[in-house]
């Protein structure tokens, strides 16, 4: 799993797969190359951001999902951008969705900056109130000024040999996510709307309206973190917290886990833990995008995470990326039958 099944006991947050954030990606949009001057960054590039959620299937022994393919109508889906390194949102893209009615659903999107980006609800400039959610694979993008958006059911780009991991890392060569689908939100955003500097931090969250309040149900920046390192009894709490508190909350416990799991020295374990704390995906747009610098759809983050946990002792799983990826927006493949 990447961030799939991130609640305690390998369940969905709130026992609802629509609240399960599965993956987050950040990479340069093809044709929108990044150009950088020596003294001042000349921002002519475009960054692609993708938030996936709502996995349509689950490998054993995880119980199969029972809810539908739509976005949750009472949830707030958010992509947060930190532009100054303080683990606080300076920019936020927020999405809500209508009720699912006879196979039809529509989204509303907002773009917030400054203090508004740190408010949990949908605030800021409304980009669109008529974002069509596609369930049949047809791409229905909306152009909101300089930002391109799309939402719908897509093929899950994550690939992993779960059976092999459950059997002592004797890899089987089987991709348990080959036929999985997810709900995907894709954006192309001009770089000059993502801060002045080349480095950004990205994380996503899904919150649920409950008793008049927004309750954060899932969150993540780096792939394969919460389901991999936090023990049961800690996962739900982790999902409810904010990245700004991660170092204080998790540096000690995670360093100890890494010492025990990978044979790291205490100093090495601390350094390894700080590679993913706070849990924010860092992306330097002056450098090629491959995890841990941003994340592209072909990154083998499953193997990367096990190597991190084991201090290089667990070999790569040997799987290849999915062959249905697109070279153009929205980049993920059409949904599997």
Regions found by a protein language model. Give the residues of each.
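Surface-exposed extracytoplasmic segments
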Residues: 1-337
């Amino acid at each position: 799993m990447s961030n799939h099944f991130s609640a305690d006991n390998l369940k969905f947050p709130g026992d609802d797969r629509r609240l399960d954030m599965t993956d987050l990606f950040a990479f340069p949009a093809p044709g929108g190359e990044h150009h950088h001057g020596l003294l001042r960054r000349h921002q002519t590039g475009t960054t692609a951001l993708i938030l996936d959620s709502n996995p349509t299937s689950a490998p054993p022994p995880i119980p199969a999902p029972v809810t539908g393919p739509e976005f949750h109508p009472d949830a707030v889906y958010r992509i947060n951008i930190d532009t100054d390194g303080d683990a606080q949102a300076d920019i936020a893209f927020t999405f809500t969705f209508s009720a699912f009615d006879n196979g039809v659903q529509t989204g509303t999107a907002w773009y917030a900056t400054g203090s508004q980006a740190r408010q949990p609800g949908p605030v800021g400039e409304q980009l669109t109130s008529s974002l069509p959610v596609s369930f049949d694979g047809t791409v229905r993008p909306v152009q909101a000024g300089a930002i391109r958006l799309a939402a719908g059911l897509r093929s899950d780009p994550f690939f992993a040999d779960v059976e092999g991991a459950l059997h002592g890392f004797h890899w089987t060569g089987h991709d348990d996510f080959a036929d999985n689908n997810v709900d995907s939100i894709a954006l192309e955003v001009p770089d000059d709307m993502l801060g002045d500097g080349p480095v950004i931090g990205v994380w996503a969250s899904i919150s649920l309206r409950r008793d008049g309040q927004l309750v954060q149900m899932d969150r993540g920046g780096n792939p394969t973190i919460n389901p991999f390192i936090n023990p049961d009894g800690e996962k739900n709490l982790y999902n409810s917290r904010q990245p700004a508190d991660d170092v204080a909350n998790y540096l000690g416990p995670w360093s100890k886990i890494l010492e025990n799991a990978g044979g790291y020295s205490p100093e090495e374990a601390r350094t390894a833990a700080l590679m993913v704390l706070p849990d924010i995906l860092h992306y330097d747009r002056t450098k090629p995008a491959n995890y841990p610098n941003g994340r592209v759809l072909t990154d083998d983050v499953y193997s990367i995470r096990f190597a991190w946990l084991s201090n290089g002792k667990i070999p790569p799983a040997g799987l290849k990326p999915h062959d249905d990826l697109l070279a153009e927006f929205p980049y993920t493949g059409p949904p599997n039958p």
